[in-house]
């Protein structure tokens, strides 16, 4: 490609929380004159439809999904797997190495760079073999990735292999975070020295660290100390914070309603229900595209929502093929009738961006996934945290301890909350003594985030700097 239009291969990891922000970032790259090819497997192609309809110049590379004994036939996205499906999916996608190399070898004008998800570290080896650059796209924040990279590079071990509460300290990371072992990344906790699958995972993370640069969906004012730390840790300044990366047409109901799948309630009906509610009177409850509550967790959550007296929207994911369907995702039979009028239940996908931006929303009870975190902050909505795994415990600490826009509600993927305590927190989140303070702090972060992506803002400049870098590197590689 020419100097003004570098060609980049985008490779998203097939999970909604990973795909959607990278696809939104891809839209921004196209708007800045970058030529794009996106790599997906057949069943993930529909996720590209909104992007392709807006940007018909984007090319697609559709490669067959490799078979794997732990992934049911027909499943190509981790939304259809239980939480432990991440490891199998990461290993399985590594089988695409040779088909990708073949495609590059046969392309008349191949890409000069690969931008791939943080879980696809094997693409660094592909880029090195081809003599091009690989950039990590991180759908997690800088604090969380600092912890993850420290784990995989340093490989700390428990003193007592049976003590799940043993603290892991990270003294070199700003604010010296520490986490009990059970809160550490489950992918890291599953590591077995010499095991081919988990050794492959470790190699992927080390390849991330060795890649040419990292693009973060975060903003400087939210994670400045961690972004600075990572530049020192990596030994270079090729770290760009371009967030919050917003979806095109973020206020368009038709665009947002099916952005991540189908819903049991139309977006227009959800918004009409919210229109009938008072300002700052509704708690939105959602635990992301991956987590499915156990029936006992769901029972206690339902009791808490009932006892709290607050208006609410509950977005509840159903059990996937890998769950024991009788033990997960079942909403109590009494619940919906008892809370009719005061509560709205949405099964599977909910138009979260539209919900959070509505004037009626007072608080968000969340698993603290990074996309949910950013979507709440961009809407100026305080949070109730219930981290369950992955990067979520680090994100909760950032929200509660550092920015004071959240309060802790529960912790752990298997933890069953106390319904009385949770009911009190839900009520406090709507009309408690410190609600206004949290709302003001959240509103301040909202203004900072919005100004950052406007022309002249920090994230706007970071995006421009990254595109300039891609052009310069493409010129060098082509020469």
What name fits each language-model region?
Residues 1-220, 224-479:
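Glycosyltransferase specificity loop/lid
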């Amino acid at each position: 490609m020419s100097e003004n239009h570098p060609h980049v291969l985008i490779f998203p990891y097939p999970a909604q929380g990973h795909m959607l922000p990278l696809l939104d970032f891809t839209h921004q790259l196209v708007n800045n004159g970058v030529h794009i090819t996106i790599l997906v497997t057949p069943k993930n192609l529909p996720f590209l439809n909104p992007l392709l309809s807006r940007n018909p110049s984007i090319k697609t590379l559709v490669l067959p999904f490799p078979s794997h004994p732990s992934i049911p036939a027909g499943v190509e996205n981790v939304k259809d797997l239980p939480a432990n499906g991440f490891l199998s999916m990461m290993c399985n996608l590594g089988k695409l190495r040779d088909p990708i190399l073949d495609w590059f070898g046969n392309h008349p004008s191949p890409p000069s760079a690969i931008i791939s998800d943080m879980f696809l570290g094997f693409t660094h080896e592909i880029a090195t073999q081809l003599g091009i650059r690989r950039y990590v796209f991180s759908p997690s924040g800088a604090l969380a990735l600092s912890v993850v990279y420290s784990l995989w590079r340093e490989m700390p071990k428990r003193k007592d292999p049976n003590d799940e509460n043993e603290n892991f300290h990270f003294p070199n990371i700003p604010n010296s975070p520490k986490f009990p072992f059970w809160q550490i990344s489950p992918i890291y906790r599953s590591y077995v020295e010499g095991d081919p699958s988990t050794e492959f995972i470790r190699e992927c993370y080390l390849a991330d660290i060795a890649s040419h640069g990292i693009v973060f969906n975060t903003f400087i004012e939210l994670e400045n100390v961690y972004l600075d730390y990572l530049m020192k840790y990596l030994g270079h300044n090729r770290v760009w914070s371009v967030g919050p990366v917003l979806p095109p047409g973020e206020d368009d109901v038709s665009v947002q309603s099916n952005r991540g799948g189908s819903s049991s309630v139309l977006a227009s009906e959800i918004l009409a229900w919210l229109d009938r509610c008072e300002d700052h009177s509704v708690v939105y409850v959602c635990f992301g595209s991956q987590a499915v509550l156990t029936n006992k967790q769901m029972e206690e959550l339902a009791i808490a929502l009932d006892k709290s007296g607050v208006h609410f929207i509950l977005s509840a994911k159903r059990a996937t093929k890998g769950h024991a369907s009788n033990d997960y995702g079942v909403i109590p039979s009494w619940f919906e009738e008892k809370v009719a009028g005061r509560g709205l239940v949405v099964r599977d996908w909910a138009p979260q961006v539209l919900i959070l931006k509505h004037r009626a929303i007072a608080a968000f009870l969340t698993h603290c996934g990074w996309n949910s975190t950013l979507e709440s902050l961009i809407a100026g909505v305080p949070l109730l945290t219930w981290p369950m795994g992955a990067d979520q415990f680090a994100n909760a600490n950032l929200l509660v301890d550092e920015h004071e826009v959240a309060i802790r509600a529960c912790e752990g993927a298997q933890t069953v909350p106390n319904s009385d305590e949770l009911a009190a927190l839900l009520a406090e989140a709507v009309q408690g003594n410190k609600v206004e303070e949290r709302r003001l702090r959240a509103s301040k972060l909202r203004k900072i985030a919005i100004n950052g992506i406007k022309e002249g803002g920090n994230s706007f400049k970071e995006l421009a700097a990254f595109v300039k870098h891609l052009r310069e590197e493409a010129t060098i590689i082509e020469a």
